[in-house]
Amino acid sequence: MSVLGVGPRTVTPHLRKGMMESSSGISLARAEAFLRLFAILVLVLTACLLGFDTQTKLLFSTIKKTATFRDLGALQVVVYVDSVAAGYNLLQLGRGFISAKLKGKLINVSYVTLPWVCFLLDQAAVYTVFSANTAALQASIIAVTGESSLQWMKVCNRYTRFCIQVGGALLSGYLASLLMVLLSSLSAFSLFRLYSPKQFHLLKPT
């Protein structure tokens, strides 16, 4: 028996379950913080790789043309979407930090509302980032292969370095999408663990 009179046998199953859930919640919060920080870095990297990618070439022996991400609308969308997504994840990271610091000091109107909001926002963010990246990939393939039926010439045979950097940015964008899928999965777990596994739409007792 311990000095305080609380030995291993005196710990009730309810208390033991609460301690395990608390430990699980801390581990989940740390995993989410790590993934969000990593996602922010990758999203910023993607936006910077595209935003600062330029290459100037002499065309037809007389005309200088500089290729930038603004020449392809899909690349512009990726830059803007990834920048907004990075800002969103930064806000979520700040929200998690504040929640950890103020835990137990704030009165929540509904403890299930915030997990629902985070879940829906994470879902929307990952779909938007993935869709923008895929649209840019499809447009970039045309720049590589050309499209004779539409009289679109190949571009990457002239702007090789520019296209290679775009390819690296798109790979980075898909990595960011994967990280955000993991974040969305964590949000789903954090939300649906609040519900009873035996009865649909019934919250667990707090």
From Swiss-Prot:
Family named by the database record: Belongs to the Casparian strip membrane proteins (CASP) family.
Parts of the chain on the Cytoplasmic side: 1-31, 93-111, 183-206
Entry keyword Transmembrane helix: yes
Subunit relationships: Homodimer and heterodimers.
Membrane-topology descriptor: Multi-pass membrane protein
Coiled-coil region: none
Compartmental location: Cell membrane
Protein name: CASP-like protein 2C1
TM ranges: 32-52, 72-92, 112-132, 162-182
Transmembrane helix keyword on record: yes
Organism placement in taxonomy: Eukaryota, Viridiplantae, Streptophyta, Embryophyta, Tracheophyta
Pfam family, one: CASP_dom
Predominant subcellular localization, coarse grouping: membrane
Record key words, sorted: Cell membrane, Membrane, Transmembrane, Transmembrane helix
Organism of this sequence: Vitis vinifera (Grape)
